[in-house]
Amino acid sequence: MKFVDEAFVRVEAGNGGHGCLSFRREKFIPRGGPDGGDGGDGGSVYFVADKSVNTLVEFRYQRLLRAQNGQPGMGRLRSGKKGEDLIVPVPLGTTVYDKETSELIGDLIEAGDKLCVARGGRHGLGNTHFKSSTNRAPRRTTSGEEGEARELKLELKLLADVGLLGLPNAGKSTFIHAVSKATPKIADYPFTTLYPHLGVVRVEEYRSFVIADIPGLIEGASEGAGLGVQFLKHLERTQLLLHIVDIAPLDGSDPVQSIQAIISELEQFSQNLSQKPRWLVFNKIDLLAPDVAQARCQEIINRLNWKGPVYKISAIKRQGTELLCYDLMSFLETNQRSI
């Protein structure tokens, strides 16, 4: 299924049913009085977070979501049937905005979270309500109210504990494949990963976390170079970023400049994202002699004046990945997840 993380949709709640103008008519009761029933309330439109839904692609084909109208009231004090609510499943991590005002309407995080995005109109009143000591045969009723209608923007931000950063071909997809059951496409050309991938990393039977891989960034991504920064939003809910660095790039590029380019793109996209905890992960150490790999890693650390955690791994050979995953689990358990 195609991955879609943004959609626009119009929602229309049902109108309330009109009140009924009716009088009791029975044999031997010539003046039975009013017996008009109320209309039914209009149905509302709800979004519900559903863990079986992974993308907003359905909204590309269904741009109008409409709940049922309430039915009009009837004689003999019978109320009209309420319009049926429209319940629409959306992925966990869906944020809903008013398209015109950009107002945040709600965030659906946990399975079962429910958000009313258009409320149904109230029912109209039958003429029974307007009977009084001075008006025994009222001919007054009220109309049902119109249901709410609005244009919405839906945005999906994946729910993950750890996010992967790096240039194309840094080895992010290989890493997530090595430590989880995720199966992203892996090859030796740029932009193999075209859409975000999630993987569940289990360090023990009951200890696990979710890791997100997004398409690689390149310098100028904020201006639209490469695949741009459109997928960075999927890292905004993470607790920690792993910056995967290729220490043996085939094109001979400078890893320090590559790291600085990624940091620059992060800062231009979001200060909040750029300030998240970030660990450096030097990948592909198996391609260099141990002493050369050690010297190159230390040179990068010195030039960056890096003070944070550093790991040296070979994702393809699963070298150093187990320790990294256990340390990630410990970090996440110490710093309880907050979205």
Curated annotation (Swiss-Prot):
PROSITE patterns: G_OBG, GTP1_OBG, OBG
Molecular function GO terms recorded: GTP binding; GTPase activity; magnesium ion binding
Principal location class: cytoplasm
Cofactor: Mg(2+)
EC number: 3.6.5.-
Domain Obg span(s) in chain numbering: 1-159
Taxonomic superkingdom: Bacteria
UniProt keyword annotations, A-Z: Cytoplasm, GTP-binding, Hydrolase, Magnesium, Metal-binding, Nucleotide-binding
One Pfam match: MMR_HSR1
Enzyme class label: hydrolase
Family annotation (InterPro entries): G_OBG (IPR031167), GTP-bd (IPR006073), GTP-bd_Obg/CgtA (IPR014100), GTP1-OBG_CS (IPR006074), GTP1_OBG_dom (IPR006169), GTP1_OBG_dom_sf (IPR036726), OBG_GTPase (IPR045086), P-loop_NTPase (IPR027417)
Binding of Mg(2+), residues: S173, T193
OBG-type G domain ranges (all copies): 160-333
One GO process term, biological-process aspect: ribosome biogenesis
Segments of this protein annotated with the region Disordered: 127-147
CDD domains linked: Obg
An annotated GO cellular component: cytoplasm
Protein task: An essential GTPase which binds GTP, GDP and possibly (p)ppGpp with moderate affinity, with high nucleotide exchange rates and a fairly low GTP hydrolysis rate. Plays a role in control of the cell cycle, stress response, ribosome biogenesis and in those bacteria that undergo differentiation, in morphogenesis control.
HAMAP family, sorted: GTPase_Obg
PANTHER family xref list: DEVELOPMENTALLY REGULATED GTP-BINDING PROTEIN-RELATED, MITOCHONDRIAL RIBOSOME-ASSOCIATED GTPASE 2
NCBIfam families: Obg_CgtA (TIGR02729), PRK12297.1 (NF008955), PRK12299.1 (NF008956)
Designated name of the protein: GTPase Obg
Organism: Coxiella burnetii (strain CbuK_Q154)
